[in-house]
Every structure is written in structure tokens, then in C-alpha cells.
Curated annotation (Swiss-Prot):
GO molecular function annotations of the record: peptidyl-prolyl cis-trans isomerase activity; protein folding chaperone; ribosome binding
Similarity annotation: Belongs to the FKBP-type PPIase family. Tig subfamily.
SUPFAM superfamilies: FKBP-like, Triger factor/SurA peptide-binding domain-like, Trigger factor ribosome-binding domain
Highest rank taxon of the organism: Bacteria
Gene from which the chain derives: tig
GO biological process: 'de novo' cotranslational protein folding; cell division; chaperone-mediated protein folding; protein transport; protein unfolding
Protein name: Trigger factor
Gene Ontology cellular component annotations, sorted alphabetically: cytoplasm
Its biological purpose: Involved in protein export. Acts as a chaperone by maintaining the newly synthesized protein in an open conformation. Functions as a peptidyl-prolyl cis-trans isomerase.
InterPro entries xref list: PPIase_dom_sf, PPIase_FKBP_dom, Trig_fac, Trigger_fac_C, Trigger_fac_C_sf, Trigger_fac_ribosome-bd_bac, Trigger_fac_ribosome-bd_sf, Trigger_fact/SurA_dom_sf
Note on domains (UniProt): Consists of 3 domains; the N-terminus binds the ribosome, the middle domain has PPIase activity, while the C-terminus has intrinsic chaperone activity on its own.
Domain PPIase FKBP-type, first and last residues per copy: 161-246
Pfam families: FKBP_C, Trigger_C, Trigger_N
Species whose genome carries this gene: Pseudomonas aeruginosa (strain ATCC 15692 / DSM 22644 / CIP 104116 / JCM 14847 / LMG 12228 / 1C / PRS 101 / PAO1)
């Protein structure tokens, strides 16, 4: 077998492969012999059909199948021989396909980049330090109570935080517009759900009162047809209800699966959950900085085929997340290309760190992670057992642990600065990283 390789770009290879005619004929004859054993042709007993008849009827198809299989077989033989690592399937162009002659074809494909991860010493990481204080727990209890607020109808003028039941009709230049009218809408004053001036204009209104609000849609309003336009809203207040926060009692605690432990027990459970959230938030922010540092220190070119595959995965995820009667391939590829490229680059860099440092998932950390996740459930032992009985899910956890070990490896060489912050700042979501 003759093989030659040409580099047409940093990652693209053009490989010419020559397969000897003898190998082709051997493969064709093997297929014809297999066909002869099972062929049913009128006038001949099974297995007794002359080879000349078999050739006449089946040689063309046998040769086509043999050629296809040989191209696939010899392609992988050739890339192993040439020590190439293809990324994606090749584009194959036959050059010589004649009977009795050597088969020659050209395979064009991309290869994985060859690189060594460097620059770990230049990566700078700010690691947040925080604790959950009693005041933080108090604030969280207030949040939980507000999330379970009930509203009771009152006979008084509306004020901020009240919930109003309203009917309204919106008009522009005297004409009602699409989406500008509704009946029985529940609106909490001060929530910011409506355009500026709408909620403020209902403060002081009573049930049965009608108010006319002359407002202007903001310039950056999501509906461009309405942006910066003046509108008149006629609003009828059907009822006014004031918020009632639930008491911190056993009935309230039971909403969160905590029973018969009293306020101290509930506070302890809330604090435990907050501490778990805090650990995860700090770990996530450190990981994001490490990954961003690896990206900046290791600018690599990646195969277009891998980016395309990742774009397709992101399309499928988008359809699953947002639903709708749309097929993944109907979503424009450019919506996902930057994110896809970032994922592919990071995946290759992380894999190279694992390879360079000979990392393997620490099974002790795998169990710790599973137990940490299981602690959020009412029956953690069952959750732990489920993970260890389901290999695919267990392997997902191993992958996460391996990424954590990559982060630890980088932190050993990076410049790490600890910063003391409040709980609120520590758990605040980080800004999304820019695409690579």
C-alpha cells in the first residue's frame, strides 16, 4: 500500500492512498465465493452455480462493495502508519477505479492539533473566602417567607407590594394594539413588570376605580413596533390585596421537607444548604477563572469538524430547552459558533492537561461528590446507591471530578489570591465569559 500525505493547512491533510490490484481482486473473489454459497438461481442447485454465472450476475456489485470497504479499511491503516489523528470523517475522492488496476484515492480530512499546555505560571486566580453568618440565615429566611407570600383582599388604597387584580386597555393614537389589553391580570406594585409609570400610576387606587395612564414605551422596548411610542392605558382596579408573610412555624417548615425540628432545626437546615451553595459557588468561580486562564495562555486552532459537531449538539439542547415546533437544523449555526468553539478548545486543553499530568479520576472524590449531591435529598442513601448502580451517571461524575483535578493541578502553579467577601457577593453569579 502506497501512502503520501500533504499538509494543505495547519490542520487539514490531503492523503493519497494506493491499494494494490491483487488485494482488490482477493476481496472481490472472497465476496463472490460467499455469494455462490447462498445464491438461488433457477436451473442450478444451491451452492452449485458455476463461478462464471456468479461473476456475470454479481461481480459489479461485489466490486463496488469491496472498493467501499477497502477504502474505509485502508484509510485507517494509512492514518495509523502515518501517525495521524483524524478529527471527523474524511472526504474521499477516487482517482483510479478501473478493474485490474491499483485503486488510488485521495482522502481529505482534519487532524487534532498537537500542542503542549503551557503558561500555567502566568494564570492569576482570585479565590473568594466567605462564611454564612446568622444575619445571612436571617436574610434567607426572609427570602423564603417572601417566596411563599399570600395575598389577602383589603378595602383600602393600593400601595407598593400590594397585589392588584386589574383590567386594562392600551391604545396608541386612539387604536388598541396587539398585546396591549388584558382582563383579570394580577400585578404586584413595585415589581417592575410593566413599563415605567404604569405601576406607579396605580398607587393610591381603590377597588372599582378607573385610572387613565399616559405613558411612553422605552426606546429599548423588546417590541420594536412599540418602542418610544406614546400610549394611553385605561385601567380598572378590580381588587387590592396586601401581602401576608407566613409565620415561621411547623406548617411553614414542612413546605421544605423539614418536620418536627422547630425553628432551630429549620435554621440549621437552611444554613447547611447555604453553606453547600457557597462551596459550589466559590468552586465554580475558581474553575471559570482557571479555564479562562488556560484559554488565554494556549490559543490553539481547532478542527472545523469538531466545532460543527458541537454546534449541532447546542442546537439540539436549545430545542429541548425552549421547545417549539422547530427542528435543530433550522436554527442558524452562527448563533452557536462562538460558544461551540470555546467548548471545543477548552475540551482539548483539559484533555491535554490530563494527558500531560497522567491524571485519573480520584474514586474517593467521586464518592464525596455523590454524597454531597445526595445530601440535598430526603433519602440520600438511595441517591448514592442509584449513582453507583448506573455506570453512565457515575462516569459523568468521574468526568466532573477529573475536571476538578485539572483545576487543582493548575492552581498548584498559578498565582492565587484569597479575597474575603460577604456571602451575598460570593454566591452572586459571575459574568458570562467571552467566547474564545
Amino acid at each position: 500500500m502506497q501512502v503520501s500525505v500533504e499538509s494543505t493547512s495547519a490542520l487539514e491533510r490531503r492523503m493519497t492512498v494506493g491499494v494494490p490490484a491483487e488485494r482488490i481482486e482477493t476481496e472481490v473473489n472472497k465476496r463472490l465465493q460467499q455469494t455462490a454459497r447462498r445464491a438461488k438461481i433457477p436451473g442450478f442447485r444451491p451452492g452449485k452455480v458455476p463461478m462464471s454465472v456468479i461473476r456475470q450476475r454479481y461481480e459489479a456489485s461485489a466490486r463496488q462493495e469491496a472498493m467501499g470497504d477497502l477504502i474505509q479499511e485502508t484509510f485507517y491503516e494509512a492514518v495509523v502508519e502515518q501517525k495521524l489523528n483524524p478529527a471527523g470523517s474524511p472526504s474521499v475522492e477516487p482517482k483510479s477505479f478501473e478493474k485490474g488496476k491499483d485503486l488510488e484515492y485521495i482522502a481529505t480530512f482534519e487532524v487534532f492539533p498537537e500542542f503542549t499546555v503551557s503558561g500555567l505560571e502566568d494564570i492569576k486566580v482570585e479565590r473568594l473566602q466567605a462564611e454564612v453568618s446568622d444575619a445571612d440565615v436571617d436574610n434567607m429566611l426572609d427570602v423564603l417567607r417572601k417566596q411563599n407570600t399570600r395575598f389577602e383582599v383589603v378595602e383600602r388604597a393600593a400601595q407598593n407590594d400590594d397585589q392588584l387584580n386589574i383590567d386594562f386597555v392600551g391604545k396608541i393614537d386612539g387604536e388598541a394594539f396587539a398585546g396591549g389589553s388584558a382582563k383579570g391580570t394580577l400585578l404586584v406594585l413595585g415589581s417592575g413588570r410593566m413599563i415605567a409609570g404604569f405601576e406607579e400610576g396605580l398607587v393610591g387606587a381603590k377597588a372599582g376605580e378607573e385610572r387613565v395612564l399616559n405613558l411612553t414605551f422605552p426606546e429599548d422596548y423588546q417590541n420594536l413596533d412599540l418602542a418610544n411610542k406614546a400610549a394611553e392605558f385605561t385601567v380598572t382596579v378590580n381588587s387590592v390585596a396586601e401581602p401576608k408573610l407566613p409565620e415561621l412555624n411547623e406548617e411553614f417548615f414542612a413546605l421544605f421537607g423539614v418536620k418536627e425540628t422547630g425553628l432551630d432545626g429549620f435554621r440549621a437546615e437552611v444554613q447547611k444548604n447555604m453553606e453547600r451553595e457557597l462551596r459550589q459557588a466559590i468552586k465554580s468561580k475558581v474553575k471559570n477563572q482557571v479555564m479562562e486562564g488556560l484559554l488565554q495562555a494556549n490559543p490553539i486552532e481547532v478542527p472545523k469538524a469538531l466545532i460543527g459537531n458541537e454546534v449541532n449538539r447546542l442546537r439540539v439542547q436549545a430545542v429541548q430547552q425552549f421547545g417549539g415546533n422547530i427542528k435543530p437544523d433550522q436554527l442558524p449555526a452562527e448563533l452557536f459558533e462562538e460558544q461551540a468553539k470555546r467548548r471545543v478548545v477548552l475540551g482539548l486543553i483539559v484533555a491535554e492537561v490530563v494527558k500531560q499530568h497522567e491524571l485519573k479520576a480520584d474514586e474517593g472524590r467521586v464518592r464525596e461528590m455523590i454524597e454531597e449531591m445526595a445530601s440535598a435529598y430526603q433519602e440520600p442513601e438511595q441517591v448514592v446507591a442509584w449513582y453507583f448502580k448506573n455506570e453512565p451517571q457515575l462516569n459523568e461524575v468521574r468526568s466532573v471530578v477529573l475536571e476538578e483535578q485539572v483545576v487543582d493541578t493548575v492552581l498548584q502553579k498559578a498565582t492565587v489570591t484569597d479575597k474575603q467577601v460577604s456571602y451575598e457577593e460570593a454566591v452572586k453569579p459571575a459574568e458570562a465569559p467571552q467566547a474564545a
